[in-house]
């Protein structure tokens, strides 16, 4: 039996006629591949410097609110405001999540290739709210890579060559330490995130060999040294000297313990 393409007309035949109809299993014209998307759209953000990428990540939440409030255009690209999460997004459409992942991959490329860019990242990343709340020390290339990926779409990023194991280890860390990290599992399933990353890796034929496991251990050692803090506690740390002084006015002391909830 000849296999048919998945078209509107053939779907109608499948639903309304008694003739047997088998579709081509390999047809996947509508699937999304972030690696291809990044390659095809990278020139749209090629003028972003290390500083501008770092600023984007540091102010991500505020930038996202502005971009998602209405149709947002930069250059020839328009990020359309979607009315709800079920609204269809095409494989070539720019979304904030895809743009965010592109900026992160672009930044990692710069800090890997340029020593001054790496130094700039080492100096800037500790001031980023999410990195501060994780207690992640960004002192070298690998720790900076983790810092740049933190908060991004790990399933998208894991599809890019040489990002696989870093994205997977970070996803597993967030799942294993979701309580300490203060992640609300009703809003974000860390286990599901690990599954999505693994699905991407399996679909691209990623081989988790001994070399990759060795890289995983290096990333895991960096993350094991983190001292996660609740957001409120991270902010309190910023005012540590002043808070200590004010508490003393009431003959009291303050505990800046790493895992306290505020």
Curated annotation (Swiss-Prot):
Keyword Glycosyltransferase: no
GO molecular function: RNA binding
Nucleotide-binding in keyword set: no
Record localization: Virion
Any matching Pfam family: Tospo_nucleocap
Domain of life assignment: Viruses
Primary localization: virion
GO CC term, one of those recorded: viral nucleocapsid
Keywords: Capsid protein, Helical capsid protein, Ribonucleoprotein, RNA-binding, Viral nucleoprotein, Virion
Similarity field: Belongs to the tospovirus nucleocapsid protein family.
Function: Encapsidates the RNA.
Name of this chain's protein: Nucleoprotein
Organism: Impatiens necrotic spot virus
Encoding gene, per UniProt annotation: N
